[in-house]
Amino acid sequence: YLYMFERTHIKVNSEAIARDLQHHTLQQDSWDSMHKQDINHCEGNFFYDAWQLKPEFDTPIMQDLMLKLGPVGQAKIIVVPPGTCYQAHADVEDRYHITLQADHSYLIDLESDEMYPTLKDDWCYLMNTQRLHTAANFGYQDRCQLVIRRLLTHHQLMDPHHIHIKPMQ
């Protein structure tokens, strides 16, 4: 990756997606001050198998988005209240981000000290989440995003070597 947060070729209708999702209740996250709601569920391995839309989110707009993205993992609406941010962290899988509402909100790469604005601009962005980062809302309204995990791939070791470690006497 050149950057932590890059625009993809995928154009979306963020207004239509926001309208489609607006009538759903979000739950308070037990780990932080954010509100979140999964829009799909896992029927297999959390990190490796494609997730399916929950019936209440299985609409033509969401089906179209999922077709554009291909098989994906967990997808959730995340609301970051004004004046709040996430703890610094890194994740194991990359994620797509679609901003549905934002006002002076940023994803911040803490390794390079770069800030990326989260704009409601009808584009899907790809984020390299293995970098130490945070999301911060410096604005006066909630930052709402649809965040979608990319699936991990199974890797096959080429020419593995076995070693045995024994304690010294």
Where are these regions (language model features)?
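Non-heme Fe(II)/2-oxoglutarate
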Residues: 1-69
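Conserved SAM-binding loop
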Residues: 117-121, 128-130, 135, 146-150
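A short hydrophobic beta-strand segment most commonly corresponding to one strand
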Residues: 96-99, 124-126, 140-158
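Short beta-strand His + acidic residue motifs that chelate non-heme Fe in jelly-roll/DSBH
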Residues: 86-89, 106-108, 127-140
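Fe(II)/2-oxoglutarate
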Residues: 160-169
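A short beta-strand-loop-beta hairpin characteristic of the jelly-roll/cupin
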Residues: 99-120
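Short, conserved beta-strand element in jelly-roll/cupin
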Residues: 79, 90-106
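A short glycine-rich, His/Asp/Glu-containing loop-to-beta-strand
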Residues: 62-82
